[in-house]
């Protein structure tokens, strides 16, 4: 990824252009059983790690000196959340602005195959009452249309948290977007179905270190 192909922005993260074709599979280490199911490596693991560290810096700048309840959206958000929390801890450990964190979990079901369903299922919503009066940082893997996150935020508002911030590794450019933007964005990407780094296609591909584009053969192979 060069400066000309991908541009950084504090407001919308690193913008991956529509014409970005990614990297050839054979220049990276990938599980053999997935190689025929992938189109390209879209965002390499090292780039994800560096961008996550920068987001941690921004969070420290904005909400340091607070106790934060980190609400990790499972399953796709767990790896981004783990890495982000670790970066924040490392920064906090060597800073005058200390952030103490407690991590909680929620699951949102909104996909079948590669299609976003109309109804969002919240699993673990009965625990949301614990967030009353708390500073909450929601950590998500990807914002697609924005409707899922908007629905979750509306649900959280019923419990009157003190503050809510959202960090999403990816935000997808989509014609059906409601224009919702998280407070912290890793990468803004084209409207492509991505897998890897804990993002899945029917529970497959979570174990990939890189973010990749799944091909049609892969979609058909793992379709339910």
Curated annotation (Swiss-Prot):
Pfam families named in the record: Pribosyltran
Q: Name one GO cellular component term.
A: cytosol
GO annotation (BP), single: purine ribonucleoside salvage
Superkingdom field: Eukaryota
**What keywords tag this UniProt record?**
Magnesium, Metal-binding, Nucleotide-binding
Q: Which PANTHER family match?
A: HYPOXANTHINE-GUANINE PHOSPHORIBOSYLTRANSFERASE, PHOSPHORIBOSYLTRANSFERASE DOMAIN-CONTAINING PROTEIN 1
What's the protein name? Phosphoribosyltransferase domain-containing protein 1
């Amino acid at each position: 990824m060069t400066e000309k192909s991908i541009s950084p922005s504090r407001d919308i993260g690193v913008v991956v252009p529509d014409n970005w074709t990614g990297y050839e599979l054979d220049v990276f280490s990938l599980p053999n059983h997935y190689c025929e199911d992938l189109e390209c490596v879209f965002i390499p693991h090292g780039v994800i790690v560096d961008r996550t560290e920068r987001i941690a810096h921004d969070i420290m700048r904005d909400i340091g000196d607070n106790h934060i309840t980190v609400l990790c959206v499972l399953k796709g958000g767990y790896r981004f959340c783990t890495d982000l929390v670790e970066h924040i801890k490392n920064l906090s450990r060597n800073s005058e602005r200390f952030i103490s964190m407690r991590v909680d979990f929620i699951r949102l079901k909104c996909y079948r195959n590669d299609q976003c369903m109309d109804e969002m299922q919240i699993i673990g919503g009965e625990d949301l009452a614990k967030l009353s009066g708390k500073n909450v940082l929601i950590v998500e893997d990807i914002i697609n249309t924005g409707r899922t996150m908007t629905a979750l935020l509306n649900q959280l508002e019923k419990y009157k948290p003190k503050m809510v911030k959202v960090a999403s590794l990816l935000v997808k450019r989509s014609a059906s977007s409601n224009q919702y933007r998280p407070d912290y964005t890793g990468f803004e990407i084209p409207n492509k179905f991505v897998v890897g780094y804990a993002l899945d296609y029917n529970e497959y591909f979570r174990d990939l270190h890189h973010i990749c584009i799944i091909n049609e053969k892969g979609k058909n192979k793992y379709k339910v």
